[in-house]
């Protein structure tokens, strides 16, 4: 029994983690009243302390753990330790971390949808709605694509990471004035270590709720970095679902005072909508792309080139693992949830930018004598009934 203690501890924490997820799913309305606030408060407190380090603390912890596991394998062989005892004490800390991760951040997957918090109506969109939204985001992206600073190769030039974090913070501050749901921690977003490894895994950014750290892979093409930073901070703001983090990241970019952030947000919004349009109507997709500016085309090609550079079995396997992780938290679409942001982007366009075709009616003015006591009787709007 002594040799199974670690395995028993691991099993207990796995069971507790599963129980937490079931409770979060079952009582999501009740939990949504307090959990997001508690989660954001925890990440703000821990993130403020961890933010003093330029490196990602979780990466250091991961390296130490991996080295300890490898060293323990050698010790197990030399000292002839019981295999199940060794396995238990490896699995125990992993299961404890998984439990704590779910406790302080993971239950955000069961929060109410972002559009409900924003009181944004998300209708079932048509191809016409999608085309209009795609055209709008392309128009905005075209406008900013010629305004951002570029180098001799035509690539977007970024400011240093500290300055980008300041801009990001102000961008979310602007957004909070309209929607208080975006109040909370702002990072700072760190540069992700092991950039080449992360690129081979298809990782542009990562947020670890347990340490309150958001990080961005600076190896990605520069035009997408501001959007990715805003996306990762959205995870700190308790938006766990990838489509909602994408939408929050776009809104932060749109509300930014910096044209590079705005361009990054509109570029990604256009690409998400265009990809969905391609799936439903290739001809319209081709028509849209014909209107793209040369600068935007250059950026899209640079993004594709960077992706092609790292594509392979490693990225495919990493995608499958992350897909499984999302499914375990109830996101049956897996990694496809990233592109689900299209519905939110179309809804935002309809709510904010689609021209209103209904005639505006003058509001009633109680101080206007003619309105209060009209000289002519009001016109009947329905046909009179026969006696």
PLM segments and residue spans:
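Hydrophobic alpha-helical membrane-insertion segments
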Residues: 9-25, 96-101
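Membrane-embedded alpha-helical segments of integral membrane proteins
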Residues: 15-76
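Active-site recognition of the HExxH zinc-binding catalytic motif
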Residues: 54, 225-246, 250-251
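Transmembrane alpha-helices and immediately adjacent membrane-cytoplasm interface residues
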Residues: 68-74, 80-116
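Membrane-interface segments at or immediately adjacent to transmembrane helices
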Residues: 108-174
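Post-HExxH zinc-binding segment in Zn-dependent metallohydrolases
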Residues: 128-133, 240-284
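Auxiliary, metal-adjacent structural segments of Zn-dependent hydrolase domains
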Residues: 149-218, 222
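Pan-zinc metallopeptidase signature
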Residues: 295-387
